[in-house]
A protein has these predicted regions:
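Acceptor-binding helix/loop patch of EC 2.4 sugar-transfer enzymes
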Residues: 51-61, 109-146, 187-196, 207-208, ...
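Short hydrophobic beta-strand element within catalytic cores of glycosyltransferases
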Residues: 324-327
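A short, well-ordered alpha-helix in the C-terminal region of glycosyltransferases
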Residues: 353, 360, 367-382, 388-394
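Aromatic "clamp/platform" in nucleotide-sugar-dependent glycosyltransferases that forms part
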Residues: 307
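A short, active-site helix/loop in glycosyltransferases that binds the activated sugar's phosphate group
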Residues: 142-198
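Conserved acidic donor-binding segment of nucleotide-sugar-dependent glycosyltransferases
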Residues: 339-340, 344-351, 360-365
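Nucleotide-activated donor-binding/catalytic signature segment of Leloir-type glycosyltransferases, i.e.
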Residues: 253, 259-286
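Conserved donor-binding/catalytic core segment of Leloir-type glycosyltransferases
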Residues: 159, 200-224, 230-235, 245-248
Length: 412
């Protein structure tokens, strides 16, 4: 079959899937704005988005206009391919940035599989500390979903990584959404007793012999519970005088609102730094993937906190590495972590409970080691690439049969 992937930063979530389809003999192409990697057997094409938002655009429509601009330029590239005689059998695309809005208008006969990562809800209201409820906010969120609603109407089938994510899409579309996780390479992300890292700034070498608390996010921000973790740290370090804390993440914002003054990282560090032994707190920023894996492999306790939002890959990777996870008792985490079985869960807002759980794990590492082993088994059984990739391949290869009998009217 001819299969076309569309992702602004290809390969993104499609790294293993696209390469595997090419290996199986399919003709695989990909379209991106800024490709991040080359894959064997996959022809990657680029397109440009020169347009920008107009000066008089209604603020509630800025997101939709941005996505429409991307959709236009992506569609023009698709039309160019069409004029050259190319028509895919299957299009697999991430609609989150708008590129796929007009796919079915260019190729109504192609089967369109949409990667459905997030349907916007008022998750910002979860944490009262940052909740700002207003009619304007609700209207903005509703309008942000406008592009997704167009995609849901046009797609032949959807793919979501978790049940929690799939359940957030409108009920009338859920029967056309398959839940298959992206997949973690458990052969690469695995426990390693001899792992170690070197912290250059403070000239420290850490291994599994040390008490190491890990906290990982793309950016250190409230959506991922950074403020809750920082407020627990002074007491944790007081009770565990030999513990070292390593925080991975940038200073920016991936989700939610930006910090009104400076960065969230500095704001919540400043709140507690007078009560911290900063010689044992290590902010390492964003790190190369091999170093990230080594860090997970030496972790004595991995803390993962999040509001009800898309689950981070890093949690599944931590479990695959055999970490003892202390996670927030929020729905996305509870889909993966079962309290007392393959990790520990705490109330997102309860600083004392978080503190006591982390201290308990560090105080009795041998007793809690079984949770890390169980976490690894959970990933091997349900989230491993070896389990997920065959299901993804089967879904893509079945897409011509899943095409809706009445494709949308061609508009271009």
């Amino acid at each position: 079959m001819r299969i076309l992937f569309i992702h602004q930063n290809f390969p993104g979530q499609f790294k293993h899937l696209a390469a595997a389809l090419a290996k199986r003999g399919h003709e695989v192409k990909a379209l991106a704005i800024t490709p991040r990697a080359e894959l064997p057997g996959v022809q990657v094409m680029k397109y440009a988005v020169p347009g920008k938002n107009g000066p008089s655009t209604h603020p509630w429509l800025l997101d939709l206009e941005t996505k429409t601009i991307r959709a236009e330029h992506c569609a023009r590239k698709l039309l160019e391919l069409q004029r050259c005689g190319y028509t895919p059998d299957v299009v697999v695309g991430h609609p989150g940035w708008g590129e796929t809005l007009l796919v079915k208008d260019v190729w109504p006969e192609a089967a369109f599989l949409a990667f459905l990562e997030l349907f916007y809800r008022e998750d910002s209201l979860f944490d009262p500390e940052f909740a700002v409820r207003s009619f304007e906010q609700a209207a903005r969120i509703r309008m942000k979903n406008a592009a997704f609603l167009v995609t849901l109407d046009a797609m032949d089938w959807g793919l979501s990584p978790t049940s929690w994510q799939a359940a957030h899409f409108p009920p009338e579309h859920r029967e056309r959404i398959s839940v298959i996780f992206d997949g973690v390479d458990t052969a690469a992300v695995r426990p390693a007793k001899d792992a170690w890292i070197h912290l250059e700034k403070k000239q420290k070498r850490l291994s599994r012999e040390n008490e190491v608390i890990t906290f990982v996010n793309r950016n250190l921000e409230p959506y991922r519970g950074y403020h809750r973790f920082m407020r627990a740290l002074p007491r944790i370090l007081e009770l565990r005088p030999n513990a070292e804390v390593v925080l991975v993440g940038g200073d920016g914002v991936s989700y939610g609102a930006p910090c009104p003054n400076g960065t969230w990282k500095e704001t919540f560090l400043n709140e507690v730094k007078d009560r911290l032994d900063l010689s044992r707190v290590h902010f390492v920023g964003r790190v190369p993937y091999p170093l990230f894996l080594n860090l997970l492999q030496i972790s004595s306790c991995h803390v993962y906190l999040t509001v009800p939002f898309v689950l981070s890959w890093s949690l599944i990777e931590a479990m695959s590495a055999g970490c003892v996870v202390v996670g927030s008792r929020t729905a996305p985490v509870m889909e993966v972590v079962e309290d007392g079985k393959n990790g520990l869960l705490v109330d997102f807002f309860d600083t004392d409970e978080l503190t006591s759980r982390v201290v308990e794990v560090l105080s009795s590492r041998e007793r809690f080691a079984s949770l890390g082993l169980a976490a690894r088994r959970t990933v091997e059984q349900h989230y491993a690439l070896s389990k997920c990739l065959p299901k993804q391949l089967e879904l893509v290869e079945s897409m011509p049969k899943r095409r809706k009998t009445s494709p949308s009217t061609r508009a271009l």
